[in-house]
Amino acid sequence: MADLVYPPVIAVVKGFWKYLGFQFDFQGDENIPRKGGAILAINHVSYLDFAIAGTGALPVKRFVRFMAKKELFDHKIAGPLLRGMHHINVDRNNGAPSYVAALKALKAGEIVGIFPEATISTSFEIKQLKSGALRLAVDAGVPIVPTIVWGGQRVSTKGIKPNFKRGKTPVSVTFGEPIHYAKDVDIETASQQLRQVMISMLNQVQEKYPDSHVG
């Protein structure tokens, strides 16, 4: 699909990161398929996670199509940008159209970004995962790449006044090994296993994080 909007938005986002002084650390980008469909299952700790995770995929020249809530698409400024970047509109009261759109994107060879916790974790721990990412992976026949973002919560997260002052905030994006699923996989069991993988990855990221506190 044509990407006329994504590149200029990326340029603006990179400028924003530079202004904030973000110090990025990308790990495991070799685990992102260079071609073909895949799902990034991303933890959710800040309002910046989608842009942070998308930035992490740029070194391998993949644009991520994020599943984002309808309210963002309804915004007069954000909406046209999201549609222009071919992100996927999620209406929580009617999820079928977004599922079909994500499935179509995956079968067309796109990378789809999903936050399986469905909301920001205010404890910064991995919440219970919704099953949608697993079901999509099975139906589309694509792998899930567990993805951990960390650091954005220090700038903008749920329930805390954002702090957009310039600084030197370490921000990391870690991509785990792709997980492939059989057609007859038990979704509930696989979801719990994916959560455990993400918990383990998050613990490792926190241990290596340059600051002593986790939040």
Each model region followed by its residue ranges:
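Catalytic core of membrane glycerolipid acyltransferases/transacylases, capturing the structured
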Residues: 33-94
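Hydrophobic/aromatic ligand-binding patch that stacks against planar heteroaromatic rings
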Residues: 56, 81, 104, 135-139
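Helix-adjacent hinge/juxtasegments
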Residues: 86-110
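A charged, well-structured terminal subsegment
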Residues: 100-108, 171-203
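Catalytic-site beta-strand/loop segments enriched in glycine and acidic/polar residues
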Residues: 105-133
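A cross-family acyltransferase "interaction/gating" segment
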Residues: 124-187
